[in-house]
Amino acid sequence: MSGEKTEQPTPKKIRDARKKGQVAKSKEVVSTALIVALSAMLMGLSDYYFEHFSKLMLIPAEQSYLPFSQALSYVVDNVLLEFFYLCFPLLTVAALMAIASHVVQYGFLISGEAIKPDIKKINPIEGAKRIFSIKSLVEFLKSILKVVLLSILIWIIIKGNLVTLLQLPTCGIECITPLLGQILRQLMVICTVGFVVISIADYAFEYYQYIKELKMSKDEIKREYKEMEGSPEIKSKRRQFHQEIQSRNMRENVKRSSVVVANPTHIAIGILYKRGETPLPLVTFKYTDAQVQTVRKIAEEEGVPILQRIPLARALYWDALVDHYIPAEQIEATAEVLRWLERQNIEKQHSEML
C-alpha cells in the first residue's frame, strides 16, 4: 500500500530532521570515548597522578606541629591546589572527548528545536508512555547486556590472575603494588575493548532505528517531490543550472565556428568551413533574441568574426539544421560570406607581417 512507510528517507527528510535535532547518535559512543581517553591518560600520566596523590595524602601530616588555625588554612589551600592538579587535566580531556564524540557521530549541530519548551514533555500521561515504551525497554535490555558482558570480561581477568591474588598476603609490600598495577592495566584494557564493541553495536542499532523512524510512504515522497518542484528556490537553482550548461555549450559552439551570421539582434547562426576538411559549410548553432547578445560577446572574446546578413540569417534559421550542411538554396549566399571571411583572414595576415 502507498500509505505504508517502506521507502528510505530522502535527503530533504534527513535535512529537516537534522534541523529539529533528530540525528543518529549513541550514548555508548560518548561513554566509550570518555573511558578510553581517561584510561589512556591515567596510564600515560600515572607518575604525575601518583606524585600529586601522594602529596595530597601527606599534607595534613606535614603541618601537624603547627597550631590548628594555621594548619587548617595551609591544609585547605594546598588540598584545593592538589585537587586542581588532579582534576583539571581529567575534566579538560573529558570535555574535549565529549564534544569530539558528538561531532564524529553527526558533525557540528546547533538546533533550537531541540531546546524549545514542549508541553508533551511535562505531560504525565506522555511521560508514562515514554517510561513504558518499547524504546525504554530496549534501553533497559541494553544496560543488562552491557553489565553482563563487562562482568564476564572482569571475571576472565580475575580468574586468570586468581593464583597471583591468593599469593599476595605472602608476597610482601614490595610486590603488591606492581602486581595490582598489572591486574588493573589488564582490567582497563579488556574493559576498553568491551566498551568499544558495545559502542559500535549500539551506534549501528541507533542508526537503524533512526532511519526506520524517518522512513516514508510513497505518497509522502511524491508530495515532497511536488513541493520541491514548486519551490521558488528549487526553480531558481534549476534555472541557474540550465543557464550555466547552456552558457558552456554556447561558448563551445562559438569557438568552433568560422563565422557568425547575424540579423543583427534577433538571430545568430554559426557557420564552420575549413578548406580541405569540410566538403560544405556546416551550421554549428542557431540562437535567437536574448541569446544573440551573449553570442556576440563570446564571439568578440574568442576572435570569431561577426557578419550582418539579414536575409541569409533568416533563411538559415528556418531551413538549416544544427550540425548539418547548409541547404542548397543558401549555398551562393553562404559562399559570399566565406569569400568575405577569406579576405578578412588575408588582410589580418598582411597586417601581422607588417
UniProtKB/Swiss-Prot annotation:
The keyword Membrane applies. Pfam families: Bac_export_2. It is a multi-pass membrane protein. InterPro entries: BsaZ-like, T3SS_substrate_exporter, T3SS_substrate_exporter_C. Keywords: Cell membrane, Membrane, Plasmid, Protein transport, Transmembrane, Transmembrane helix, Transport, Virulence. Residues 1-20 are annotated as: Disordered. SUPFAM superfamilies: EscU C-terminal domain-like. It is found in: Cell membrane. The chain crosses the membrane at residues 30-50, 79-99, 138-158, 163-183, 187-207. It comes from the Bacteria. One of its GO terms (biological process) is protein secretion. GO terms for cellular component: plasma membrane. Belongs to the type III secretion exporter family. PANTHER family: FLAGELLAR BIOSYNTHETIC PROTEIN FLHB, SURFACE PRESENTATION OF ANTIGENS PROTEIN SPAS. Component of the yop secretion machinery. This is Yop proteins translocation protein U. It comes from Yersinia pestis. The lineage of its organism: Bacteria, Pseudomonadati, Pseudomonadota, Gammaproteobacteria, Enterobacterales. The gene is yscU.
